[in-house]
């Protein structure tokens, strides 16, 4: 595989991941709209349980999609490291991303991103269960 093909494959994977991430953001918006409906109109216990499951499922989905984005970066970097004569640009990417094999993880590697998702979960849960 050539360097061009690796970058082309990375670009294609980002397009696909971007579509799934956009869907995840839409679903997150739907979850927050559901929280507003619960706060405005009230809800029974079973409705709150289902809203909780729906919200946590959306957070799980989004964390999974963002882990795939990280895996795309790292897989491309690993593929570049297997080239016989990588370019300077490829070397910079390998230095920045690393060249070790990785598996998807729901725990974000960036601590700020992890805190952001924790805040989203707290906002959803307090909106559903507290009034």
Which residues does each predicted region cover?
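Hydrophobic alpha-helical transmembrane segments
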Residues: 16, 90-123
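Cytosolic-side membrane-entry/anchor segment at the start of a transmembrane helix
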Residues: 1-32
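Transmembrane alpha-helical segments in integral membrane proteins
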Residues: 26-36, 107-131
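Compact alpha-helical subdomains of small soluble proteins
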Residues: 67, 99-102, 130
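Membrane-interface helix-boundary motifs at transmembrane edges
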Residues: 35-46
């Amino acid at each position: 595989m050539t360097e061009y093909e690796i970058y082309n494959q990375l670009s294609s994977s980002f397009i696909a991941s971007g579509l799934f991430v956009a869907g995840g953001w839409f679903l997150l918006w739907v979850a927050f709209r559901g929280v507003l409906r619960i706060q405005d109109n009230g809800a029974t216990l079973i409705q709150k349980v289902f809203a909780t499951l729906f919200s946590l499922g959306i957070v799980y989905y989004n964390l999974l999609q963002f882990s795939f984005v990280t895996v795309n970066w790292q897989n491309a970097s690993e593929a570049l490291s297997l080239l016989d004569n990588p370019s300077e640009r490829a070397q910079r990417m390998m230095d920045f991303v690393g060249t070790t094999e990785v598996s998807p993880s729901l725990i974000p590697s960036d601590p700020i991103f992890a805190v952001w998702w924790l805040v989203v979960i707290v906002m959803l849960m307090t909106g559903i269960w507290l009034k």
